[in-house]
C-alpha cells in the first residue's frame, strides 16, 4: 500500500476493476445470496444535450444519482442507473453552421468526449442501455407513436403561429428572436400562420391536473404547483356579444363575438372588448382603416410567446366596430389589443376596467369608461388609482347591476350564467390555460415526421413497414431554411395510396418528443420489434428522477402526457412515470466584468482574476491577471457561458481527482439548494481525502492483525469509540435515506476525527474496534468517494471478508454499542440551568437527588432544604429552592 494518496493511480485502479468486472450492468429480477428477488430501484438523471463538455451542473446532478445508486446497492437493492443523449435540436444546427460540418458529425464526436468525461467521474452507469435520440433505432419509435396517435385522432393538423424571418426565409424558435429581430439576419420578425401537427394534450388536461394533486406525493410542492398553474384550470362562463357586422353580405362569426370569463359577476362593468390582431373582426375593420391595418401588422411582428405577452407594453386601437351587450343591449366598442392571443380561447376578451388591473391600466391609457359594479364594505372606489380590493371576489357584492345587486360572487355567476343560457348566448364552461402541443418544427436536425404529401391524396401516413423514415446525416445547414427542402434523395418518394410521385414531409418533431419516453427505452434496450417490452414492466415506474427546476413544466408535463397515451395504447400499465422527483439546485460562481463606453460588458473567468480581501476575507477589489488592471465584481450568479464564470470539471478532476470534485459538490450544499463554488472548499475536500488515506495507511498493520472479538468485553475507551462510531453511522444512514448528502459528508468527517482522536492500546480488542470503525467509515464514505474507498477496502483486506465494497452489506447500527453505563443530567434551580451531573444509567431517584444536591455549582444557589425536587429520568433534575 502506498504511503501517499495519488488520485490518478487510485482512480485508474478503480476504473480498471469496474470495467473488468462489468460492475454496473443491471439485469432484471436479480437475486440476493439467498436466491430471493432483490427489490428494484430505478434512479435516473435527466439526459444531457451532447454539447461537447460536461459542466458543473452535470457533475452535481450525476453525482447525486450515483451516490443514491451506491447506497441503495449496498442496502441490497437491484439498482439501475442508465444514460443517454438528447441529441437532436437547434444547438447542433448552429454549431454545424459555425464549423461547416454536418450536425451528426459534431454530435457523435461530442458524445464520445462526454462519455470519456463521465467515465472519469466514476459513475455507475450501465452503458449497455445507452440511447441516442438521433439514431434511427430510437426515433423509429417516435414515428411509430406519431402514426398510432394520428390514427386515434390524438395528433391532428391545423395552422399555427410561428416566427418567420423574411431575410433568411426560415422559421425561428422563440429563443432565436431577440428584441423582435432574427438572431442571424437582424430582420424584423413576422408572425405567420402555417400548417403544423399538434398533439391533443388538452384531452388529458383534467387527468394531468388530478394526478398532480393525488398521485405525485414524492414531487416537490413547488413543481406540482407550477404544473397545476401551467394546466391552468378555470371555471367560468363563455358568452357572446351579438352584432350585425357583415363581410361580403355574410355575418362575421355568425353575428357573435365570443369571450370567456371567470368573473361573470362583473359583466355589467364591461366598457370595451379587445380582439387579437388575427380576429375576423380586426381583419374586416382594417380593410377600410389603413392606420388600424398598420397597427395590426405591428402586432403580428410581436412575440408568440405567452410569457412575453404578459410582460410587454399593452397597446390597442379602436376598430370603429361595436357589439351589443347580451344583458343590457348597450353598444360596446371593439378594440384590437396586442395582448390578446388568437390561439387562446376565442381570441377575444371582455374589458372590465373597474375590476381587472390590466383593463384598468388600458382604460386609463386610452381614456375609456370605468364602471364600478363590485363593492366591498368599508372601501371607497376611485377611478384614479388601482387597489387590489377592486378584484376581490371573496368579499365583494354586486352593485350597479340591476337584478344582480347584492349578490356575492358565486350567486352572481350562477344567476348570470343561467340568464345567458336562457338567452342562448352563453353557458358555464371549464377552460384550461394548457394548449395543444405543437410538435412540428421547420428544422432539419430532428425526427422526420412520417408523412408523405401527395398532390392527389393530400397528407398520407408512411406505412408502418417503411419505418423508420431515416434522416439524412450529410446536410450542413446554412441558415437559409430547412436543408431537407433541397435534399432530393430524401424528398422523392411514391404516394402509399395512389403510387404516384410525391414528396416527404420536411418538418421534424419537437425534441420534447425525444425526451418524453427515453427513460422507458433504457428499460428495453435493443428491442427491435417493440417500443418497449416486458423489461419495462419490471423497472417502471421510475423510483427517482433527478433534474433541474427549469424542466418543471414542459418536459415533465409532456413526459406525463406521453406516458398516459402509451397506457391507453396498452403499452404500459401505470399512470405516472416518475414516483419521486428531486430538482437539484444550480451551481453558482462569482462574476467579473469590464464595461465599455457603450455599456457593453466583457466577462472574465474567475480563474483569470486576482482578488484583494479585507481583514474578514471579503473581496473589496479585483484585477485581471494578464494586464493587472481593475475589473468590476459582479456578484454570484449561475455558472454560464454568457457570464464566463464556469469551472471546467475536467480540470478539477485532473488536478485533484474525481473523488474530490464529488465530495465538494455533495458537501457544499443540500442537493435541492444552490451550490456556491469555492476553490478553498475544493482544496479542503482534497485535504480530507489525503487524511483518509494517511489514517488508513497508519492503521494498516492493526487491520491486518485484527481478529474477531467479543465486543461485550471492552474497556471504557474501546466502548466509547464504538459508541461514537455507531452513533455517527446512525446519523449518516438517516441522512442517506433523506437524500441529505451534505450532512452525510459531515458525518464522515466527524467519524474520521473520532477515529484519529481515539487513544487505544495495542490489544487485539482495540485492533478489532478500529477495524470495525474503519470498515464502517469506508462504507459510509463510499457512495460519495467511490475510488479511494474501493482501493482502501481492497488494500486493507476487507474485500476478502466482505467482498467488493460495491456489494458489501451496509453496516448495521449496534444498539448495544449505543448504550451508556453513565448519563449526564442537567440541573435547574428555580427554572435556571445551574450545572450538570454524571450518574449511573440505572441510578435510583434518591441517588440522583443526593448527587445533585452535592454538586458544588448547585449548592451556592440553595439555602437550607429545597422545597421540592423533580427528577425527569435520564434528562433533568429541577430543584425548587
UniProtKB/Swiss-Prot annotation:
It is found in: Cytoplasm. Its main location: cytoplasm. Its EC number is 6.1.1.4. Gene3D superfamilies: 2.20.28.290, 3.10.20.590, HUPs (3.40.50.620), Isoleucyl-tRNA Synthetase, Domain 1 (1.10.730.10). InterPro entries: aa-tRNA-synth_I_CS, aa-tRNA-synth_Ia, Leu-tRNA-ligase, Leu_tRNA-synth_edit, M/V/L/I-tRNA-synth_anticd-bd, Methionyl/Leucyl_tRNA_Synth, Rossmann-like_a/b/a_fold, tRNAsynth_Ia_anticodon-bd. GO terms for cellular component: cytosol. A motif ('KMSKS' region) lies at residues 638-642. Belongs to the class-I aminoacyl-tRNA synthetase family. This is Leucine--tRNA ligase. SUPFAM superfamilies: Anticodon-binding domain of a subclass of class I aminoacyl-tRNA synthetases, Nucleotidylyl transferase, ValRS/IleRS/LeuRS editing domain. PANTHER family: LEUCINE--TRNA LIGASE, MITOCHONDRIAL (PTHR43740:SF2), LEUCYL-TRNA SYNTHETASE (PTHR43740). GO terms for molecular function: aminoacyl-tRNA deacylase activity; ATP binding; leucine-tRNA ligase activity.
Amino acid at each position: 500500500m502506498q504511503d501517499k494518496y495519488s488520485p490518478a493511480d487510485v482512480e485508474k485502479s478503480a476504473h480498471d476493476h469496474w470495467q473488468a468486472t462489468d460492475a454496473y450492468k443491471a439485469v432484471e429480477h436479480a437475486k440476493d445470496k439467498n436466491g430471493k428477488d432483490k427489490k428494484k430501484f430505478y434512479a435516473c438523471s435527466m439526459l444531457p444535450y451532447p454539447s461537447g463538455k460536461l459542466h458543473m451542473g452535470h457533475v452535481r446532478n450525476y453525482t447525486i444519482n450515483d451516490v443514491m445508486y451506491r447506497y441503495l446497492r449496498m442496502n441490497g437493492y437491484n439498482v439501475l442507473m442508465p444514460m443517454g443523449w438528447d441529441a437532436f435540436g437547434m444547438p447542433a444546427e448552429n454549431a454545424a453552421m459555425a464549423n461547416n460540418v454536418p450536425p451528426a458529425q459534431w454530435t457523435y464526436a461530442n458524445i464520445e468526449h462526454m462519455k470519456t468525461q463521465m467515465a472519469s467521474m466514476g459513475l455507475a452507469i450501465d452503458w449497455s442501455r445507452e440511447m441516442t435520440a438521433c439514431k434511427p433505432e430510437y426515433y423509429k419509435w417516435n414515428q411509430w407513436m406519431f402514426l398510432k396517435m394520428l390514427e386515434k385522432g390524438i395528433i391532428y393538423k391545423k395552422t399555427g403561429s410561428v416566427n418567420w424571418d423574411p431575410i433568411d426565409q426560415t422559421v425561428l424558435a422563440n429563443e432565436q428572436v431577440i428584441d423582435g429581430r432574427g438572431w442571424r439576419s437582424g430582420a424584423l420578425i413576422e408572425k405567420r400562420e402555417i400548417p403544423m401537427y399538434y398533439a391533443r394534450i388538452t384531452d388529458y388536461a383534467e387527468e394531468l391536473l388530478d394526478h398532480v394533486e393525488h398521485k405525485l406525493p414524492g414531487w416537490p410542492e413547488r413543481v406540482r404547483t407550477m404544473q397545476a398553474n401551467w394546466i391552468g384550470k378555470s371555471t367560468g362562463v363563455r358568452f357572446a356579444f351579438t352584432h350585425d357586422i357583415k363581410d361580403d353580405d355574410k355575418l362575421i362569426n355568425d353575428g357573435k363575438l365570443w369571450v370567456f370569463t371567470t368573473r361573470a359577476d362583473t359583466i355589467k362593468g364591461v366598457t370595451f372588448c379587445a380582439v387579437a390582431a388575427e380576429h375576423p373582426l380586426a381583419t374586416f375593420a382594417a380593410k377600410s382603416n389603413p392606420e388600424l391595418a398598420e397597427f395590426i401588422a405591428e402586432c403580428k411582428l410581436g412575440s408568440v410567446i405567452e410569457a412575453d405577452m404578459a410582460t410587454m407594453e399593452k397597446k390597442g386601437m379602436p376598430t370603429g366596430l361595436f357589439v351589443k351587450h347580451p344583458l343590457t343591449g348597450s353598444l360596446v366598442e371593439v378594440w384590437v389589443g396586442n395582448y390578446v392571443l388568437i390561439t387562446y380561447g376565442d381570441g377575444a376578451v371582455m374589458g372590465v376596467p373597474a375590476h381587472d388591473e390590466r383593463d384598468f391600466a388600458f382604460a386609463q391609457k386610452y381614456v375609456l369608461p370605468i364602471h364600478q359594479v363590485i363593492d366591498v364594505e368599508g372601501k371607497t372606489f376611485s377611478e384614479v388609482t388601482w387597489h387590489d380590493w377592486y378584484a376581490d371576489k371573496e368579499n365583494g357584492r354586486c352593485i350597479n347591476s340591476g337584478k344582480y345587486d347584492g349578490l356575492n360572487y358565486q350567486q352572481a355567476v350562477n344567476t348570470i350564467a343561467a340568464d345567458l343560457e336562457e338567452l342562448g348566448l352563453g353557458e358555464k364552461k371549464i377552460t384550461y390555460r394548457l394548449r395543444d402541443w405543437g410538435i412540428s418544427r421547420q428544422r432539419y436536425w430532428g425526427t422526420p415526421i412520417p408523412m408523405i404529401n401527395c398532390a392527389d391524396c393530400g397528407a398520407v401516413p408512411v406505412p408502418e413497414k417503411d419505418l423508420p423514415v431515416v434522416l439524412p446525416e450529410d446536410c450542413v445547414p446554412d441558415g437559409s431554411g430547412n436543408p431537407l427542402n433541397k435534399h432530393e434523395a430524401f424528398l422523392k418518394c411514391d404516394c402509399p395510396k395512389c403510387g404516384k410521385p410525391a414528396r416527404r414531409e420536411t418538418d421534424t418533431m419537437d425534441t420534447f418528443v425525444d425526451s418524453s419516453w427515453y427513460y422507458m427505452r433504457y428499460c428495453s434496450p435493443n428491442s427491435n420489434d417493440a417500443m418497449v417490452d416486458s423489461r419495462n414492466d419490471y423497472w417502471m415506474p421510475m423510483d427517482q428522477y433527478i433534474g433541474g427546476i427549469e424542466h418543471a413544466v414542459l418536459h415533465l408535463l409532456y413526459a406525463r402526457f406521453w406516458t398516459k397515451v402509451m397506457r391507453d395504447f396498452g403499452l404500459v400499465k401505470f399512470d405516472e412515470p416518475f414516483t419521486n422527483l428531486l430538482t437539484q439546485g444550480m451551481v453558482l460562481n462569482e462574476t467579473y466584468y469590464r464595461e465599455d463606453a457603450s455599456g457593453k460588458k466583457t466577462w472574465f473567468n474567475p480563474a483569470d482574476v486576482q482578488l484583494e480581501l479585507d481583514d474578514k476575507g471579503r473581496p473589496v477589489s479585483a484585477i485581471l491577471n494578464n494586464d493587472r488592471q481593475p475589473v468590476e465584481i459582479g456578484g454570484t450568479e449561475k455558472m454560464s457561458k454568457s457570464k464566463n464564470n464556469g469551472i471546467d470539471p475536467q480540470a478539477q478532476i485532473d488536478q485533484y481527482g474525481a473523488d474530490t470534485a464529488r465530495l465538494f459538490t455533495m458537501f457544499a450544499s443540500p442537493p435541492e439548494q444552490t451550490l456556491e463554488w469555492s476553490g478553498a472548499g475544493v482544496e479542503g475536500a482534497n485535504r480530507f481525502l489525503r487524511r483518509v488515506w494517511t489514517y488508513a495507511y497508519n492503521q494498516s498493520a492493526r487491520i491486518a492483525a485484527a481478529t474477531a472479538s467479543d465486543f461485550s468485553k471492552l474497556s471504557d475507551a474501546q466502548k466509547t469509540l464504538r459508541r461514537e462510531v455507531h452513533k455517527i453511522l446512525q446519523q449518516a444512514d438517516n441522512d442517506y435515506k433523506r437524500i441529505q448528502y451534505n450532512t452525510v459528508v459531515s458525518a464522515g468527517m466527524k467519524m474520521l476525527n473520532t477515529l484519529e482522536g481515539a487513544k487505544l492500546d495495542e490489544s487485539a480488542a482495540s485492533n478489532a474496534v478500529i477495524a470495525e470503525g474503519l470498515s464502517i467509515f469506508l462504507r459510509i464514505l463510499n457512495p460519495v468517494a467511490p475510488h479511494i474507498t474501493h482501493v482502501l477496502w481492497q488494500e486493507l483486506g476487507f474485500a476478502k471478508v466482505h467482498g467488493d465494497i460495491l456489494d458489501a452489506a451496509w453496516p448495521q447500527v449496534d444498539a448495544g454499542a449505543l448504550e451508556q453505563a453513565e448519563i449526564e443530567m442537567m440541573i435547574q434551580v428555580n427554572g435556571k440551568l445551574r450545572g450538570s451531573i454524571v450518574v449511573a444509567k440505572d441510578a435510583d431517584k434518591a441517588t440522583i437527588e443526593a448527587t445533585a444536591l452535592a454538586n458544588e455549582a448547585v449548592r451556592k444557589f440553595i439555602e437550607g432544604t429545597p422545597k421540592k425536587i423533580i427528577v425527569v429520568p435520564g434528562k433533568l433534575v429541577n430543584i425548587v429552592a
